[in-house]
Design a protein with these regions (language model features):
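Long insertion/accessory domains within large nucleic-acid-processing enzymes
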Residues: 255, 260-263, 441, 452-456, ...
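Conserved nucleotide-binding/hydrolysis modules and their immediate coupling elements
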Residues: 204-307, 317-319, 482, 491-541, ...
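Interdomain boundary/hinge elements
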Residues: 36-42, 150-162, 196-206, 242-255, ...
Length: 600
């Protein structure tokens, strides 16, 4: 059993985790000579590649000098806390990857804390030392201090450090002397990370993730905790709620390279996939047929944000998407629940076409919406709401730890913006010409903060936040102050009309786009909502005029991403999401009806 190492990779967004794993796979000869390696094997869905973040964890294994190294990729974002904990449960050690210039970031801290609590042995990799003005020694100190803050044990604090550049494909003991391969790192992994303990006895396997194949159905993935699993043996599945079910393993697979390989038995400590089980959830245990002993299930963080999902009932319903009915959306949400641990879905007040979907944050939910949109779904979502809790009779709300890194001249603006949203500044560090400011801020305050922070700092700010705890309610927070400009009629928007209305605010539509009554087409300069007619064309006469017409000079529209739309809308607005467009609209489309309901 000395020949297996299970290792989780922990890193902040864009510190080069996926690149490093690609290089490790090259070293382990996973690609044939001359095979095209386009990179980013792990971030395999389009969304992950576009945003440069890892959402779903994946398993890869490589062979190095006779030792099998299972590499588990973890999502770096605290919004995907559910994913992180499952992965760490399968590892014996972790690879902490930090940027030689930026140092450890708040997001990394979240995952690292979980890893240290589980007692994993860390190896620190200081990456990107080829960048100009990097500071590897300081970063090493920062990592050490961070580990101390997180109450690491003495054994954990005695961690080896490897310097290198994943992009250029080298790792070494000293950052001043580059080598030409990453062997040093792989040797360190085999040397430092403990081999999994061999536990004799009845078999136990905690299901920590799901795979799905259209041929065999759902596949359970997990690490054999104790004993040996054999192909075709009879087993018991112990569910989280205490019920048990007798069944049989059809096939066992281990991970080889990027694929599966069929095997007849798996010893304790290795990670495998079990085919042929029917009803199981993540957190269930596969145990002995005769006397089952379940393992404790995975504790997953509670959701902190919720959103209303509903079917698309706008005038453009069904024009762009393939799946629009409530049954389609319901099935899709149920499918998502199977593998997305931190998600909750409940029907909204006895309706069949509205759901309250709760998750770990705006990012967690918007990734789900974006994925559905690409699969061809049409739906509408309401404004993100924070989930309140009652603790000892006091109304409490989630509070997050927020870090903003900006050039010095913008620091006062940032502090002003965050304190207005009931944030408290906890520390401020000067790093050269930039400042690192830390706050505690209610989750409500973070909704819509990113856009404002980027505008105020001319796009220079780096912002990261993670859930901290529930604290007593902090009072009202003022939302966006500008009203919306709303289309009066359905039709095509004309440049002539938009041109005449430019001084009223900024537009979210271009001339020639189709709009419908009640759609939010722009942001008003004042606080009240303004209903405008953008579908009005110029009246032409047959009298020849002496002067020439003024040409309509229309300022290009403001383009908003899904997160920005979600953060922008008010309580009485929805975001309509279709595979081709995202539109903002009022819940009540008809102008007169909306007026009446406002009076009530």
């Amino acid at each position: 059993m000395q020949y297996i190492r299970n290792i989780a990779v922990i890193a902040h967004v864009d510190h080069g985790k996926t690149t490093l794993v690609d290089k490790m796979m090259l070293a382990g000869k996973l690609f044939r000579d001359g095979q095209d390696n386009s990179g980013e094997v792990l971030d395999s869905n389009d969304l992950e590649r576009e945003r440069g973040i890892t959402i779903l964890s994946k398993n890869v294994s490589i062979n190095w000098k006779g030792t099998k190294i299972n590499i588990l990729d973890t999502p770096g974002h605290s919004d995907f806390g559910g994913e992180v904990e499952r992965v760490l449960n399968m590892a014996d050690g972790c690879l902490l990857l930090v940027d030689a210039f930026e140092g450890p970031m708040p997001q990394t801290r979240f995952v690292l804390q979980k890893a240290l609590q589980l007692g994993l042995k860390p190896i620190v990799v200081v990456n990107k030392v080829d960048k100009p003005n990097c500071r590897p020694e300081e970063v090493y100190e920062m990592v050490f201090d961070l580990m101390c803050d997180l109450n690491a044990t003495e054994d954990q604090l005695d961690f080896p450090v490897v310097y290198g550049s994943a992009k250029n494909g080298w790792m070494a003991e000293d950052w001043k002397t580059p080598t030409d391969n990453i062997d040093y790192l792989l040797d360190k992994i085999v040397e430092v990370i403990p081999a999994p303990k061999q536990l004799e006895g009845t078999p136990q396997l905690l299901i920590t993730s799901l795979d799905y194949s259209s041929y065999t159905g759902r596949i359970a993935v997990g690490r054999v905790h104790r004993g040996t699993l054999k192909d075709g043996m009879n087993i018991t599945i112990c569910h989280r709620d205490g019920t048990q079910e007798k069944t049989k393993i059809k096939e066992l697979h281990t991970f080889e390279g990027m694929g599966h390989q069929k095997t007849d038995h798996v010893d304790s400590g290795d990670i495998c996939a079990v085919v042929g089980l029917e009803k199981f959830e993540i957190g269930d245990t596969i145990c002995d047929f005769e006397n089952p002993e379940p393992l404790p299930p995975i504790a997953v963080d509670e959701p902190t944000m919720s959103m209303l999902f509903t079917i698309n009932d706008s005038p453009f319903f069904g024009k762009e998407g393939k799946f629009c009915t409530s049954r389609h959306i319901q099935d899709r949400l149920n499918k998502e629940l199977e593998k997305n641990l931190a998600l909750r879905v409940q029907p909204y007040e006895d309706t069949t076409d509205k759901w309250i979907v709760s998750g770990r944050g705006v990012l967690h939910l918007s990734v789900l919406i974006e994925t559905m949109r690409r699969e061809g779904y049409e739906l509408q979502v309401g404004q993100p709401q924070v989930i309140y809790k009652e603790i000892d009779g006091v109304k409490c709300e989630p509070v997050e730890e927020l870090t903003i890194n900006v050039p010095e001249e913008f620091a006062s603006k940032m502090i002003d913006m965050v304190t207005r949203r009931k944030g408290d500044m906890t520390s401020m560090l000067n790093m050269g010409d930039r400042v690192d400011i830390e706050f505690d801020i209610p989750s409500r305050g973070i909704i819509g903060l990113r856009t404002n922070v980027l505008t105020a700092s001319q796009g220079e700010a780096i912002m990261a936040h993670r859930f901290k705890e529930y604290q007593p309610y902090k009072g009202e927070i003022s939302r966006r102050s500008n009203g919306s400009m709303i289309a009066l009629e359905t039709g095509t928007a004309y440049a002539y009309a938009i041109d005449k209305l430019q001084d009223r605010g900024k537009f979210f539509i271009d001339p020639g786009e189709e709009v419908y009554a009640g759609q939010v087409v722009g942001e008003h300069v004042h606080e009240n909502d303004l209903v405008i007619n953008v579908t009005k064309a110029k009246q032409l006469t047959n009298v020849r005029a002496s002067g020439s017409d003024d040409k309509a000079r229309v300022i290009p529209k403001t383009v908003m991403s899904l997160e920005e739309c979600l953060e922008y809308i008010r309580e009485d607005e929805y975001v309509e999401v279709t595979p081709k467009n995202m539109r903002m609209r009022k819940v009540i489309l008809d102008h007169l009806e909306r007026k009446r309901s406002n009076k009530d």
